[in-house]
Amino acid sequence: GFQPSVDALVAQATSEQRVLDAATITGALGNIHSSAGVDLHFWLDPTNYAAFVEAVGTTLASVDPANAATYRSNVAAFVADLVALDTAYATGLKTCTSRTMVTGHQAFGYLAARYGLTQVGIAGVNPEQEPSAKDLAAVAETVRSAGVHTIYTETLVEPKFAQTVASSTGATLAVLDPVEGITDASPGKDYLEVMRANLAALRKGQECS
């Protein structure tokens, strides 16, 4: 993952440079655990992301007081966008017929918890962790028993296991983006656009009125 590169940058920091450990912020948000590990995708809950942005803004203002007003203004504007996004999700997913979302891997736990959905991941928290035949059979049984009609793949993850479950159950495939990086394949140019595209995909896939 990205951690070795992050560790290298931290090691190169000079005494004049301040390093903010994001884990001190995200840890306070409450980690989502599963048997497969810890879900680090806290930003998929817009309220978590807002808390993170505010904490980072406060730190930047303290180390660069000359530009504190700019930091505060930018933070306030982005947090307002995140509040609106949270409202759109809460409203848009309130009436979904299906409350079980089957995903390529367990990246959407924060989103599911925030909006009253149950996430079932084909792979674990690490998308490179390949599911066994037993795992695939268990997910397929959940798809059938829960009446799931849509299985979500991801822009940066090989969809072959999702395709296997879909072909055995008759479910269709749709794309959800965990916003791990913006690429040409992303359904938007920034976090807000990608999250709005995710909401549209969820409303269709979860059969929301």
PLM segments and residue spans:
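Extracytoplasmic metal-acquisition and chelation regions
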Residues: 1-209
